[in-house]
Each structure stands twice: as structure tokens, then as C-alpha cells.
Amino acid sequence: MSRVAKRPILIPEGIKIELNLQSISIKGKYGYLSRIIHDAVKVECLNNKITFSIRSGFSDAWAQAGTSRALVNSMIIGVSKKFSKKLQFSGVGYRVSLTKGNIVNMSLGYSHPIVYSLPPYIEAENPSPTEIVIKGVDKQLVGQIAANLRSYRRPEPYKGKGIRYSNEVVHMKEAKKK
């Protein structure tokens, strides 16, 4: 049984929530998100609290309720604070730059530059030529775009070159000895 679903979510000031059958819409100062909740979960919004309970007839109802609570909590945090992922480019000649229209240009040691177009609801900052910060209200989308950018040149274990998350630790291997 999930204990996550038993804790109510406190709604911060400035957040508007609409419940319509099994869909929830959350509007905050940074944007708007909506999601459809699983049929096994019953959602109620009373006194600035969102509570989750189960409906009978579903074997995985508590698991779905815990997942739904975590997703709704992430939506509230996203529209009130935004999520961000920082990527670092390490290697000789590895560079990243932003152009108008949310286009990321990367130089990663290939014979051609790599151009990646960001969706309109995702923001990016370029604090230095070897760093990029991806920001947005949707936690899953921010993480997916950061993972897509990282997949072009994942950090390799011998020299550590590649694109890594700012908090990622790359385990280095020793070179083969004769």
C-alpha cells in the first residue's frame, strides 16, 4: 500500500486548480499544465489541499494513487518555480551556443555541427561556451530534452569527454596496460 498517496498536497498561493472528472488543470505564474488522472484514483480539492484516495475494483489502485500524487505535486512545483537541468560539455573543442528561435548549436568533435531545435515552451540559457541550462514547467519534458542533448556525446569512461549533467559523476577506467 502506498504511503505517498495518503499525504495531502498543500496548494501554494497564486496557484489555480481545476478538477473536471478525471482531469486536473494547474495554472501558476510560469505556465499551465493539465493531466488525466487514472480511473482508480479519486481526487478532491478542499481548503487549499488536494487529497488522493482510491476507488474499489482496481488491484493497483494505491500504486496509481501514489503515482498520481507525485505527478500532480511535480506539476504544482513546475508552474510555481520551474525545473532546470544543467549540462556541461567537457572535451577539446566541445562547445554549445544558442541562436534565436530556441536553436542549440553543438560542436562535439564530429565533422559537422549538431543543430537541435527546442520546443517553444522550453527555455535555455548559455552561461558559458561549455554549459547549457534547460528550463521549463514540465519536469518530464525538461529531463527528456536534457537526455536527448546528452545522447549526442555521452561521457566516455577513459578520458571523461562528452556531455554530462552538472551533478553526474563519471567513473573513470584505467587504460589497458601491456
Curated annotation (Swiss-Prot):
InterPro entries: Ribosomal_uL6-like, Ribosomal_uL6-like_a/b-dom_sf, Ribosomal_uL6_a/b-dom, Ribosomal_uL6_bac-type, Ribosomal_uL6_CS. Gene3D superfamilies: Ribosomal protein L6, alpha-beta domain. GO terms for molecular function: rRNA binding; structural constituent of ribosome. Coiled coil: none annotated. One of its GO terms (biological process) is cytoplasmic translation. The keyword Secreted does not apply. Keywords: Ribonucleoprotein, Ribosomal protein, RNA-binding, rRNA-binding. GO terms for cellular component: cytosolic large ribosomal subunit. It comes from the Bacteria. The keyword rRNA-binding applies. NCBIfam families: L6_bact. This protein binds to the 23S rRNA, and is important in its secondary structure. It is located near the subunit interface in the base of the L7/L12 stalk, and near the tRNA binding site of the peptidyltransferase center. HAMAP family: Ribosomal_uL6_B. Belongs to the universal ribosomal protein uL6 family. Part of the 50S ribosomal subunit. This is Large ribosomal subunit protein uL6.
